[in-house]
């Protein structure tokens, strides 16, 4: 029994009420004074009810919050007790990475130059033992001090996600940010250089990327578990690499520099106290940070010019590249920043594993830019030798690399430093979102130092000038970065190179996996990093330079071969992130190929931009640049294939042909080729139309097969239409089912409301009963008092009253119980009915789905049959073509023998033609004679009829006169009075008789003219039937074209609507600020997006997409747009051809209209004349009526005449009106068809434009979905669910757009049907127009008419042939577009599958997190 069921609760409440009422009655009957026990029972009852209600509410809340708790819930490991909470410092960034670290704080000065927009940064509570770092000026004072820190507990931050996988870097200028640095617990005093330095953080555990080796990208490192940042849930992440052990860049930043790196663990700078820490890198011997203090140490790289280490120290070194937004080290913090590049595997910062990674490449997440911020970054790479930053000291060090462009950190200041490399779009580390961080940037593809070495790899960075390996040779050169213990190449000391960073994700280091990681970058060439290669890009000596990384184009080493310094890397580009902005940006840094070297995959490597090292800043590096270009040339593709066509000059060809010997077949073939080239077409080949011509037989067979194919295609179309109808029915039934479900739900809600109302009533009645019980208790008390004081009579009376009240109570309770039971029974019955209806509807829906699947299977079978038929048709065509070739060869052989026969045949044909013309003339003359004889016989008959009518009229007039005389006799008395009037009437009658006779003659003439016109019309109709048939064929061709255009329009509109919806939803999901604009039209919305795009990209919200990815996608979209534009041009040319044909047709129609307008005008003039005469006759008849009112007989006679005249005139006027109406209708139809054609053309152009947009948006959607699949997985924190809901939203949007497209398809089918009906009516009207042409007076000879008709027929045949060709072209284009649409549908299906996989992954994550 379910306690929370409403029915059971109601029963429980009711039962409780009954129990309470029974107790009350019992108390009343026994007159007990146990009021307190009764009240306690009521209180207990209420408490129980409150508990059950509270439990129900709590359970609902728990069910709602389970998912959230499952995502946010994390187990805290607190071996040393809880850490006291402190207010976090405002500028402290947190990088959750390594297990069990105690936090120590090192704060760097934060001079801010330009305004900065910082993404929200999670803060870490500071420990009580933490000490603030001193300024860089105090370095000398605190050089060798070692701060001891008590061990702290791992759970510094339980479930803070420092940066989501899509965190945006929103800096407009670089800025230094104080970092929270945590030394490792129990770190020893002097960690040997080759020992387990902090860089080795998980040396044997395989670098951070391997950290979840099969769980590919580092960001997903423990996919279902808190990301690497949370690397053991709240144990300061390795990114905190000893939570803010100031990165190597800060290496001796204040004092808790890298030396302080593990404050109690002897700073990494002191990393073997005897071996001056890399941070201090032989502090007195100028530390690598100060790498040649007097020589402008690399850190100071031109001290006032912002050394590369400080890379615009106030402007935030490259390390801080994405300052609050998590520097390049944090490059893709979810993807695990470049600093963590192989965090446990010895990050590139640990590049000198014992010697402290190169700046711990983003030690506190300080990116490669900070690569050795105090140590000074890789740019300082040849410090005393004028480090690469100083690459020509006066030429502005690499930090200044483009002085106005501010150091590498500022790589293109406005473009946001390399950290910002993809401006809000995931710093360089995220560059290929955890799939290739900048460390991997081109792991062997020339580390950042080399990034535009100028053409000299970082190892040789100042080749003769102490390469980075020799960086400060006595001071443990950074090249020896692992003092010989692990060269930067071994960056992940054998613990899977940085390249293996996300082993399953193919890290950039593995880019040339067999080419051994960047460290091994030429393993033995430790100092010279690729001494033999010579560029570090040649990463795996035997493997083509990483820049070529399989690109065979050019390695990143030559990244800007002649644009030496990294700052200038793409000086006009600008930022390295934008490294070749026109080409896929470094963020995508080998988007498809994964290597940074492929940075400009389709646009060849940026390094190739100038094959010669032209930079004035690195004159010493020209020779190695040439070597690199040489190595590049080796990998370049060879000469074109030998299979291509060979082009010879004319003279050599003539000489070779003259010297050769041919057989007959070869000579014939040469003749054919030459004749085709010269445009010689031998008409005689095509005149072999005798009965036994095999070509004609084959053509007939081909036509028959084509007819069979057409019938089968029609059957397939019928099956498809049936399928569409069934799909429509399915949609309707689904809508009905949904409506039914909604109704049932509404009913259920109403029932629940009724149940709650019943419960409320029960509670109210319960309260009333309680009140009554209380009243009764009061009465009982009074009665008891009276009993104590009063007599026995009162007691008896009171007992009677008590019994009466008890009976009333029992009755009331029984009535209430019966009512409630009845209501509950009704509600249960209704619920059972509703559930049955739901089950029936669900079964019906399942049956419909089964039917639909069966029909789809049938449709697939039909399509297979059609494909088979098409294949057989192609085979037959090939066989026919072979046969035709054979026949043509035979004709060529027999051509010479038939030369004489041709002349005779031509003469005979001319004679036959002359005979045929004479014969046709004879026939036409005979037909004319016959027609004239018929006309004469008709005229004779008409004359006889006219004479008979005349005699009848005379007899009638005589009878009228006799009647008049009789009337005069009767009115003999009135003769005297009316004699004068009778004389007048007689005179008038005579006049009328004469007029009537004249009218009769005119009527006879009109009848003759009408009959003549009818005869002529019949003749002309017969003649024009043939012309109309030709016009009909032309119209059918036009119809087919229009149908094909409408179909293409429908398909393109479907795609357009679908992709508009998808792109709008995707862009709205990515840029929620555009949600207000989404209500506009799509074109207006795109314009607004273009206008607001730059501002949104400059100032995007925290979870914005990577601008580098978007830029690369835009470039790809531009390329696809260019290809689609070419297709659009083809479509336009074809449409132009069809327009020309339609204009020719229109001109011919207009000419015919003008001819018939003239004829109709003449007919109208005749009609007007006849109308004038009719009006005149009507006037006369009216006069006659007025005069003959006295005599009824005269009236009858005149009315009869009027009726006959009216009949004749009405017939004539009706015919003229019909002709006029038909002509007007034809004009309207022609105008409508023309407007429809223009609309179809405009729509086709729109569709071609919209197809380009659609494909562009599809590519963007694909990339967005792929990025969402890669980057959305690690977001297991509370911020992750919105990212995981995007795929579900996209899926629902796809289904919604598909339903809309089906509706639009049905509407278009209706429109096409209406259009066909309109075309059939136009055909009919044109036929009537032809009849009208015949109606006019054609007095010219019939031979001239026949010649005109022949000319028109020939023109129409030409037009139909041209239209047929255009139709075939359009059909081919339609096929190509259909194939493209099918491909795009496949891509949409793939996207849906990916979305489903992403949903499955998110559900599995929720399960594991719970």
From Swiss-Prot:
It is found in: Endoplasmic reticulum membrane. The keyword Repeat applies. Residues 52-63 have a biased composition (Basic residues). It is a single-pass type III membrane protein. The modification Phosphoserine is found at residues 159, 165, 533, 573, 583, 615, 900, 959, 978, 1276-1277. Its main location: endoplasmic reticulum. Acts as a ribosome receptor and mediates interaction between the ribosome and the endoplasmic reticulum membrane. This is Ribosome-binding protein 1. It comes from Homo sapiens. The gene is RRBP1.
């Amino acid at each position: 029994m379910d306690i929370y069921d409403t029915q059971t609760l109601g029963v429980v409440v009711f039962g409780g009420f009954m129990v309470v009422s029974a107790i009350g009655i019992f108390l009343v009957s026994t007159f007990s004074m146990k009021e307190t026990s009764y009240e306690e029972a009521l209180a207990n009852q209420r408490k129980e009810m409150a508990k059950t209600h509270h439990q129900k509410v709590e359970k609902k809340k728990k069910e709602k919050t389970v998912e959230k708790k499952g995502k946010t819930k994390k187990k805290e490991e607190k071996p040393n007790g809880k850490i006291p909470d402190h207010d976090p410092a405002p500028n402290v960034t947190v990088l959750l990475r390594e297990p069990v670290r105690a936090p120590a704080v090192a704060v760097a000065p934060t001079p801010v130059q330009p305004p900065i927009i910082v993404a929200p940064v999670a803060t870490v509570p500071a420990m009580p033992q933490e000490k603030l770092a001193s300024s860089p000026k105090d370095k000398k004072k605190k050089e060798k001090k070692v701060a001891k820190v008590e061990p702290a507990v791992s759970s510094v931050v339980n479930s803070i996600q420092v940066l989501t996988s899509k965190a945006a870097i929103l800096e407009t200028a670089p800025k230094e940010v104080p970092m929270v640095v945590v030394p490792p617990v129990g770190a020893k005093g002097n960690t040997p250089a080759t020992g387990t330095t902090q860089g080795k953080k998980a040396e044997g555990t395989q670098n951070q990327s391997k950290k979840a080796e099969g769980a590919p990208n580092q960001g997903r490192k423990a996919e279902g578990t808190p990301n690497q940042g949370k690397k053991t849930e709240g144990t300061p992440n390795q990114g905190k690499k000893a939570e803010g052990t100031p990165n190597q860049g800060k290496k001796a930043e204040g004092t808790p520099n890298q030396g302080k790196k593990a404050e109690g663990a002897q700073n990494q700078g002191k990393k073997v106290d005897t071996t001056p820490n890399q941070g201090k890198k032989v502090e007195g011997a100028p530390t690598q940070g100060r790498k040649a203090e007097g020589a402008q140490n690399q850190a100071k790289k031109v001290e006032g010019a912002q050394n590369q280490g400080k890379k615009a120290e106030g402007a935030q070194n490259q390390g801080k590249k994405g300052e609050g937004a998590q520097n390049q080290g944090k490059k893709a913090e979810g993807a695990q920043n470049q600093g963590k590049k192989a965090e446990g595997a010895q990050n590139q910062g640990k590049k000198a594993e014992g010697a402290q990674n190169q700046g711990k490449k983003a030690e506190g997440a300080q990116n490669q830019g900070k690569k050795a911020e105090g140590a000074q970054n890789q740019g300082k790479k040849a410090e005393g030798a004028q480090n690469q930053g100083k690459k020509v000291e006066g030429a502005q060090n690499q930090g200044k690399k483009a002085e106005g462009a501010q150091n590498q950190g500022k790589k293109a200041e406005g473009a946001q430093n390399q950290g910002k490399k993809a401006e809000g779009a995931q710093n360089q580390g995220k560059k290929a979102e955890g799939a290739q961080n900048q460390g991997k940037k081109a792991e062997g593809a020339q580390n950042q130092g080399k990034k535009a070495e100028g053409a000299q790899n970082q190892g040789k960075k100042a080749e003769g000038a102490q390469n980075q390996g020799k960086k400060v040779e006595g001071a443990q050169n950074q090249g020896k970065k692992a003092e010989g213990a692990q060269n930067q190449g071994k960056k992940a000391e054998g613990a899977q190179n940085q390249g293996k960073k996300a082993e399953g994700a193919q890290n950039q280091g593995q880019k040339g996996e067999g080419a051994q990681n960047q460290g091994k970058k030429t393993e033995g060439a430790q100092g010279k990093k690729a001494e033999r290669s010579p560029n570090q890009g040649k990463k795996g000596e035997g493997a083509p330079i990483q820049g070529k990384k399989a690109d065979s184009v050019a390695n990143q080493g030559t990244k800007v071969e002649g644009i030496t310094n990294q700052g200038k890397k793409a000086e006009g580009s600008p930022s390295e992130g934008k490294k070749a902005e026109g080409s896929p940006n470094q963020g995508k840094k080998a988007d498809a190929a994964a290597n940074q070297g492929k940075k400009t995959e389709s646009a060849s490597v940026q390094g190739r931009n100038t094959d010669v090292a032209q930079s004035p800043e690195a004159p010493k590096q020209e020779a190695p640049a040439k070597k690199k270009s040489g190595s590049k040339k080796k990998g370049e593709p060879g000469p074109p294939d030998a299979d291509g066509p060979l082009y010879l000059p004319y003279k050599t060809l003539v000489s070779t042909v003259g010297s050769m010997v041919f057989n007959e077949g070869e000579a014939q073939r040469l003749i054919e080729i030459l004749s085709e080239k010269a445009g010689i077409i031998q008409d005689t080949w095509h005149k072999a139309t005798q009965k036994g011509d095999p070509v004609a037989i084959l053509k007939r067979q081909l036509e028959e097969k084509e007819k069979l194919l057409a019938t089968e295609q029609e059957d397939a179309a019928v099956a498809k239409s049936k399928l569409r109808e069934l799909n429509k029915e399915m949609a309707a039934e689904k809508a009905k089912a949904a409506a039914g479900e909604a109704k049932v739900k509404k009913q259920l809600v109403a029932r629940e409301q009724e149940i709650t109302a019943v419960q409320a009533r029960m509670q109210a009645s319960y309260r009333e009963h309680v009140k009554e019980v209380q009243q009764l208790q009061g009465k009982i008390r009074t009665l008891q008092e009276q009993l104590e004081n009063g007599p026995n009579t009162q007691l008896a009376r009171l007992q009677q009253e008590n019994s009466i009240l008890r009976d009333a109570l029992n009755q009331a309770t029984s009535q209430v119980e019966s009512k409630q039971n009845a209501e509950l029974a009704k509600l249960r019955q209704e619920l059972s009915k509703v559930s049955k209806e739901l089950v029936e509807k669900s079964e019906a829906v399942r049956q419909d789905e089964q039917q639909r699947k069966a029909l789809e299977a049938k449709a697939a079978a039909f399509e297979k049959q059609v494909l088979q038929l098409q294949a057989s048709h192609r085979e037959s065509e090939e066989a026919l073509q072979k046969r035709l070739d054979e026949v043509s060869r035979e004709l060529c052989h027999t051509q010479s023998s038939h030369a004489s026969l041709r002349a005779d045949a031509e003469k005979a044909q001319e004679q036959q033609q002359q005979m045929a013309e004479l014969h046709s003339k004879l026939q036409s003359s005979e037909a004319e004679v016959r027609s004239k004889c018929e006309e004469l016989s008709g005229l004779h008959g008409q004359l006889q009829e006219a004479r008979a009518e005349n005699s009848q009229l005379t007899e009638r007039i005589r009878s009228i006169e006799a009647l008049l005389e009789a009337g005069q006799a009767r009115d003999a008395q009135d003769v005297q009075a009316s004699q004068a009037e009778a004389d007048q009437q007689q005179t008038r009658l005579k006049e009328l008789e004469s007029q009537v006779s004249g009218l009769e003659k005119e009527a006879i003439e009109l009848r003759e003219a009408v009959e003549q016109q009818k005869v002529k019309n019949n003749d002309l109709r017969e003649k024009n039937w043939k012309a109309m048939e030709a016009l009909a064929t032309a119209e059918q061709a036009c119809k087919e074209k229009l149908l094909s255009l409408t179909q293409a329009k429908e398909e393109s509109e479907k795609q357009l609507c679908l992709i508009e919806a998808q792109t709008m939803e995707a862009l709205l999901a990515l840029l929620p600020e555009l949600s207000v604009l989404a209500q506009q039209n799509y074109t207006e919305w795109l314009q607004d997006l273009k206008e607001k795009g730059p501002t949104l990209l400059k100032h995007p919200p925290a979870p914005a997409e990577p601008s580098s990815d978007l830029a690369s996608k835009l470039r790809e979209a531009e390329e696809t747009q260019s290809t689609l534009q070419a297709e659009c041009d083809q479509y336009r040319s074809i449409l132009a051809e069809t327009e020309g044909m339609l204009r020719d047709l229109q001109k011919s129609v207009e000419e015919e209209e003008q001819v018939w307008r003239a004829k109709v005008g003449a007919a109208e003039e005749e009609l007007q004349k006849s109308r004038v005469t009719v009006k005149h006759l009507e006037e006369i008849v009216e006069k006659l009526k007025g005069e003959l009112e006295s005599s009824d007989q005269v009236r009858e006679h005149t009315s009869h005449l009027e009726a006959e005249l009216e009949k004749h005139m009405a017939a004539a006027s009706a015919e003229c009106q019909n002709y006029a109406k038909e002509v007007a209708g034809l004009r309207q139809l022609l105008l409508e068809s023309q407007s429809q054609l223009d609309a179809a053309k405009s729509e086709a152009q729109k569709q071609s434009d919209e197809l380009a947009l659609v494909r562009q948006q599809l590519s963007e959607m694909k990339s967005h979905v792929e990025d969402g699949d890669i980057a959305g997985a690690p977001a297991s924190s509370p911020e992750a669910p919105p990212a995981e809901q995007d795929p579900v939203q996209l899926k629902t949007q796809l289904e919604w757009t598909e339903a809309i497209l089906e509706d639009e398809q049905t509407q278009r089918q209706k429109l096409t049907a209406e259009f066909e009906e309109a075309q059939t009516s136009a055909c009919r009207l044109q036929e009537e127009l032809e009849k009208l042409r015949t109606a006019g007076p054609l007095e010219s000879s019939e031979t001239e008419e026949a010649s005109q008709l022949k000319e028109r027929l020939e023109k129409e045949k030409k037009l139909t042939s041209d239209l047929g060709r255009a139709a075939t072209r359009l059909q081919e284009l339609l096929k190509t577009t259909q194939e493209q649409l099918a491909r795009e549908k496949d891509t949409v299906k793939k996207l849906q599958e990916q979305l489903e996989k992403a949903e499955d992954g998110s559900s599995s994550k929720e399960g594991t997190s719970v």
